[in-house]
């Protein structure tokens, strides 16, 4: 993978000149000039997903210049490097192979000359056997009762992905009740434990090292709660499993290492739902549906690795994102799923994108002089329409948006879905084309409004439009289509990282706060006044000590 400063390429200079020509061109102008714009700027994936990127401030020339940028930054070879097991995470000297976890073709993928697929398949088979025993009721708790509740204890990638997917695929869930605990705030574990019975609860402790502070604090509290009821420590083995690689620590905790599910250092946390970290998904929807999830992602992997860049959906979305972030100065992107089951999707890719590409140092170790990762946020529609869409429509910030919706709902109640989708279609139209002063004035005249009122109110009712959006229409949200959608975003993030010359798969930014917290924790044990920090931190700690009593 080559280290190329994108701003030093000829393509970047050409894009800067092109931006000067495009900055005042409106989306309405582009549609007026080209009646065939939708067919030129949309594509269908596997007859399961339609991606419409026509309501963007781009032309064919824009995309051609962005493709030139991808070529100059050698994106094609970077994609090959990732899929071939090259150690592209250089700061940690690791391969990046979440694609191997869902490699349903089972073609060999080598790391240090060793094919990883036999181990991947062995863990999958172990997950299958274990999950079937739990789901069928064959697995019994310490009093002989079957498991009814599963509590996944993890944080970051060990929580966000499994939680998002189990929520998104609730229509496929079985009888098991799923719970997720992540925050070290004792309230989180305490509230979940109020809902479950120690005789029928299985805890999954998800920590690669089995040392993650938040996860192990919660795991020990869960164990203490369990033992108050169960008494004998030998019963822990029937109610706890580990998603980890630290067999010694797992055994010391009381978990049978036969119920330890491993994954590898080439699996990044925020790309780990496809691995043993996804055991909670398997327990929720069953192994066959989990395989469908993997298959959907694998289909998108094949599309990404084999489709020319000009028709490659993750590449196109990545390039359009760079266009807005670096040339139009758009600092955020909103992900807006019009499906309540997808209510955690934006939060999942908030981590996926911001932890991956929130970097200010390039792959050469130099501070960048351009924009890297955007801020990601969003909520399900139509809730967001009654919350923050005001700013998207009439604010002073450009917020490119991804609108996502299924054509077929899992809950066909009355005309709910038609009303939902009418809003989905209307919002992108409104954002693109707006509402002119002339139209507003005519509406007021048609209503017989007082001319004085008209002059005062009209400016507030005008919508400039020209707000860019992508629309992603799924046939239906299934394990397969969700897998493909997640992989689409993963590869978009990777593509942007390659072009922006940053390391996408490390996350050193999370370390400093943890180090300082470990230093501060012993200082909170007693009531002594603290003076070892800056005046602000000292003041906060000392007031906390005074108030806690």
From Swiss-Prot:
Top EC category: isomerase
Pfam families, sorted: PGI (PF00342)
PROSITE patterns from the UniProt entry: P_GLUCOSE_ISOMERASE_1 (PS00765), P_GLUCOSE_ISOMERASE_2 (PS00174), P_GLUCOSE_ISOMERASE_3 (PS51463)
Biological processes per GO annotation: gluconeogenesis; glucose 6-phosphate metabolic process; glycolytic process
InterPro entries tied to this protein: G6P_Isomerase, G6P_Isomerase_C, Phosphoglucose_isomerase_CS, SIS_dom_sf, SIS_PGI_1, SIS_PGI_2
GO terms assigned for molecular function: carbohydrate derivative binding; glucose-6-phosphate isomerase activity; monosaccharide binding
GO CC term, one of those recorded: cytosol
N6-acetyllysine: residues bearing it: 80, 228, 234
Top-level division of the source organism's lineage: Bacteria
Enzyme Commission numbers on file: 5.3.1.9
Active-site residues per Swiss-Prot or TrEMBL entry: 355 (proton donor), 386, 514
Compartments reported by the entry: Cytoplasm
UniProt main location, coarse: cytoplasm
Gene3D superfamilies, alphabetized: 1.10.1390.10, Glucose-6-phosphate isomerase like protein, domain 1 (3.40.50.10490)
PANTHER family assigned: GLUCOSE-6-PHOSPHATE ISOMERASE (PTHR11469:SF1)
Protein name: Glucose-6-phosphate isomerase
Species of origin: Escherichia fergusonii (strain ATCC 35469 / DSM 13698 / CCUG 18766 / IAM 14443 / JCM 21226 / LMG 7866 / NBRC 102419 / NCTC 12128 / CDC 0568-73)
Native organism taxonomy: Bacteria, Pseudomonadati, Pseudomonadota, Gammaproteobacteria, Enterobacterales
Recorded name of the encoding gene: pgi
């Amino acid at each position: 993978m080559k280290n190329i400063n994108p701003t030093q390429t000829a393509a970047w200079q050409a894009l800067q000149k092109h931006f000067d020509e495009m900055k005042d061109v409106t989306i309405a102008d582009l549609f007026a000039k080209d009646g065939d714009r939708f067919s030129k700027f949309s594509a269908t994936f596997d007859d399961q997903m339609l991606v419409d990127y026509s309501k963007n401030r781009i032309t064919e020339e824009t995309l051609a210049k962005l493709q030139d940028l991808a070529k100059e930054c050698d994106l094609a070879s970077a994609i090959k490097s990732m899929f071939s097991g090259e150690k592209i995470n250089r700061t940690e000297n690791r391969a990046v192979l979440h694609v191997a976890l869902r490699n349903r073709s089972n073609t060999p993928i080598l790391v240090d000359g060793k094919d990883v697929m036999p181990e991947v398949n062995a863990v999958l088979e172990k997950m299958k056997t274990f999950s079937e025993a739990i789901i069928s009721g064959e697995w019994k708790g310490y009093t002989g009762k079957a498991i009814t509740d599963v509590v996944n204890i993890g944080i970051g990638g060990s929580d966000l992905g499994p939680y998002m997917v189990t929520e998104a695929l609730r229509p496929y869930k079985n009888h098991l009740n799923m719970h997720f605990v992540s925050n070290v705030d004792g309230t989180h574990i305490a509230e979940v434990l109020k809902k479950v019975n120690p005789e029928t609860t299985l805890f999954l402790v998800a920590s690669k090292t089995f040392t993650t502070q938040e996860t192990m604090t919660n795991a020990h509290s869960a164990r203490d709660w369990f033992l108050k009821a169960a008494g004998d420590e030998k019963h822990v083995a029937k109610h706890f499993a580990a998603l980890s690689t630290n067999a010694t620590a797992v055994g010391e905790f009381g978990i049978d290492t036969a119920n330890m599910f491993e994954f590898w250092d080439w699996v990044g946390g925020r790309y780990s739902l496809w691995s043993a970290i996804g055991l909670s998904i398997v327990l929720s929807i069953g192994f066959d549906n989990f395989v469908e999830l993997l298959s959907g992602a694998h289909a998108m992997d094949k599309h990404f690795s084999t489709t020319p860049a000009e028709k490659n959906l993750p590449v196109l979305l990545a390039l359009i994102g760079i266009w807005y972030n670096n040339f139009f100065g758009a600092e955020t992107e909103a992900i807006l799923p019009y499906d309540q089951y997808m209510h955690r999707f934006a939060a999942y890719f908030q981590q996926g994108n911001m932890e991956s590409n929130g970097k200010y140092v390039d792959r050469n170790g130099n501070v960048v002089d351009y924009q890297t990762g955007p801020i990601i946020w969003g909520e399900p529609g139509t809730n967001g329409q009654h919350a923050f869409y005001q700013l998207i429509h009439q604010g002073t910030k450009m917020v490119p948006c991804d609108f996502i919706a299924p054509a077929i709902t899992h809950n066909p109640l009355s005309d709910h879905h038609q009303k939902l989708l009418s809003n989905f279609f209307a919002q992108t139209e409104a954002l693109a084309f707006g509402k002119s002063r002339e139209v507003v004035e005519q509406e007021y005249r048609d209503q017989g409004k007082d001319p004085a009122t008209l002059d005062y109110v009209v400016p507030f009712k005008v919508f400039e439009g020209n707000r860019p959006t992508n629309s992603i229409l799924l046939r239906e949200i299934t394990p397969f289509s969700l897998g493909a959608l997640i992989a689409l975003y993963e590869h978009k993030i990777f593509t942007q990282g390659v072009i922006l010359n940053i390391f996408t798969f490390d996350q050193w930014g999370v370390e400093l706060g943890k180090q300082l917290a470990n230093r501060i924790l012993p200082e909170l044990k007693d009531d002594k006044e603290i003076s070892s920090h800056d005046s602000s931190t000292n003041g906060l700690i000392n007031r906390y000590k005074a108030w806690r009593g």
